[in-house]
């Protein structure tokens, strides 16, 4: 059943409130842009790249120049967990931090937003989650100010008001939102992304393009989100294969970082689609599955399902043209372009079964998709059922 939406909405909103500094070498100048603060909680992942590549040292040098004290919390895992976020918030409270600085990939960005919220409010993160088994409480106070320094492209968290968080106990992966979760400052320095390994460049880059693919075919598109989405798709499609093949190609890194930022704006003035709901359920059950790879594994079956429902044929044709099929006339040309893109970024050989996914989980996953992030189904042009979602999982499975 199709939901009723306008082809394009000529009204839109824009509440993006982030000071953005984009360009190579910007991290070296961050002290010029940092807001006044007494003590920062620096949040990063439990990996080695931020420290090993010297990014953390550069940040600390700039904090010293600015006269801001700091403490480092470096325990964030991929698909950040509520328990880790609560621990980070406790550190921020104990150390009396008045600003949070995230440096790392999407997990560090999202975890930092959640830490910023919990650090300035009583209780724990899941008290404030509005979906699924969350406590649905309203925060008493605004989140602490956040500075975002992405070292990978992908989530667009440097430009949006949301954060994706996970709970292993409830098997939920959902999101929190709030105007105060926009970073006060985002430093987007493509030089920081040169060290990202090939496969993660591909996974994270696909997350970036997926935000805009979904943002262009959902039911709440507007002329503002369309502008961002098409330019994001063009940049990531044209330059991600180059970044995958040569990580030192700084122009490619810049264009992919720009596309990721634009995709963040798409989510801020529009939204994604239920493809993200399906993936969040998938990686909630299989925590080691990278989010971007989950989207890759689901994308062809998901978009093919919508194309067969003829919910927005012209938009899929337009995307096919932007993705290299200049004479596209059939919506299925988009699937052809998507399949080629998967090959170009070297992700066509991955399978769900590589990560322990089993078909007997699909029914439960489908219910989780609706329960934990059902809001995204409300913006789809087609009214999905649990059975539809199970079918997409099944067709994606290898």
Regions found by a protein language model. Name each.
Residues 219-228, 243-255, 270-275, 289, ...:
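Flexible, glycine/charged-enriched surface loops at secondary-structure junctions
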